[in-house]
Amino acid sequence: MSKEFTVYSKPACAQCDMAKNFLKSKGITYKEIELDVGQPKVLGKTYEDVSAFKAANPDAKSAPQIFVDGKRIGGFNELRQMLQ
């Protein structure tokens, strides 16, 4: 059974792009949820879902935030460590 990866990203975020490119280079598909500082531009999620994410993960202040099978692993560096 393959793992489900979710990447919470922000526009013009170099670390977010690095994480997504890293996943692609490993042949891993992922779901992206893009959070904008102003009005949330969310792919496949509602504003309430994004608000719930922020409330449940108050220490997740940087982007990207990466989840594997629903569990937050952290950002790009943690993703790279996990997959190497």
Stretch-by-stretch model annotation:
Residues M1-I33:
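Local sequence-structure signature of Cys/Sec-based thiol-disulfide redox active-site neighborhoods
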Residues A63:
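Conserved nucleotide-sensing/catalytic segment adjacent to the nucleotide-binding pocket
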Residues F67-Q84:
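Non-catalytic, surface beta->alpha helical segment in thiol-disulfide oxidoreductase systems
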